[in-house]
Amino acid sequence: MSEAALTRSQVAAMVDHTLLKPEATAADVTALIDEARSLGVLAVCVSPSMLPIRADGLVTAAVVGFPSGKHHSLVKGAEARLAVDQGATEIDMVIDVGAAVAGDYSAVLADILTVREAMGESAILKVILETAALSDEAIVECCRAAVRAGANFVKTSTGFHPAGGATVEAVELMARTVGPGVGVKASGGIRTTQAALDMIAAGATRLGLSGTRAVLDGLTD
């Protein structure tokens, strides 16, 4: 699908409307859910502590090991299992970025496998790589580990790392590496319509956005 062919509703159907600020309140998350419904997006992505707030009619994603990825793998697994039990249908987990930087891809694989096994097969697993902090080689190897572990998506960024967020180059590399059977979620710093379209053109099949309205307002149906 070309950029010119994309309508507002088509892009909205790729969006995880996201609120992960540590100061977010229950009222903020309720407002996020209401806005997500009004915008017609696919999903909301929230902190697991906010899962008791119902988001009927929307896919609900929760983050795990967020944002550092330095939690013990068993803690990540328990967090993912609890999130699924509380209604999350998708899990966005952060890898141990330090292990990736060190080239310890066996540890990266084991970390992802622990979460995948703990959460079960009923929910979608997205694996956050923090690509701005990684070399191209590390991005490729972490993508391969995610595929081997049974992930459904690889994801660029938490949006909280000082190295930055999603780039077209990282998305292209991830899409080439995982192939058509695994999705690519671009997130972190996508604030304009053109930036979103550029990510889609590069191979992103899902977008993590906090400023969703501003992005969608640049499109028509």
Curated annotation (Swiss-Prot):
Single annotated GO MF: deoxyribose-phosphate aldolase activity
Top-level taxonomic group: Bacteria
Residues spanning the membrane: none
Main location (coarse class): cytoplasm
Pathway entry: Carbohydrate degradation; 2-deoxy-D-ribose 1-phosphate degradation; D-glyceraldehyde 3-phosphate and acetaldehyde from 2-deoxy-alpha-D-ribose 1-phosphate: step 2/2
Alphabetized Pfam families for the sequence: DeoC (PF01791)
Role summary: Catalyzes a reversible aldol reaction between acetaldehyde and D-glyceraldehyde 3-phosphate to generate 2-deoxy-D-ribose 5-phosphate.
UniProt subunit comment: Homodimer.
Family under the similarity heading: Belongs to the DeoC/FbaB aldolase family. DeoC type 1 subfamily.
Protein name according to UniProt: Deoxyribose-phosphate aldolase
Source species of the chain: Rhodococcus erythropolis (strain PR4 / NBRC 100887)
Gene from which this protein is expressed: deoC
